[in-house]
Amino acid sequence: MKNVRFVALALAAAAPFSNGVAAAPRQHVVVIDKMRFGPLPNGIHVGDTILWVNRDLFQHSATARDGSFDADLPAGKSGRTVMRRAGAIAFACKYHPGMTGVIKVAR
């Protein structure tokens, strides 16, 4: 009987999380400093926003190689991009091609 109660409680506790409704979009931050993209966040999903913060003294960009986003980032400024598709999205700074990264976006 204890096992039945435990299973019933576990199912009841999980019910609010299994309603099929997608989580609300989140904002993730990537800092650009010293000619590098900072650590890339985990847990990015379609619909989430990335806030790119340029702390460098130079203009940079966050430009997807597939054209899905392109944020120009003057020195000391920031910009946002919304992730519209799932997958591994390679990106680079169009002004400094050695600055690269890959964002992993889940559905």
What are the residue ranges of the model-derived segments?
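Extracytoplasmic copper-binding redox domains, predominantly the cupredoxin/blue-copper superfamily
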Residues: 2, 8, 16-107
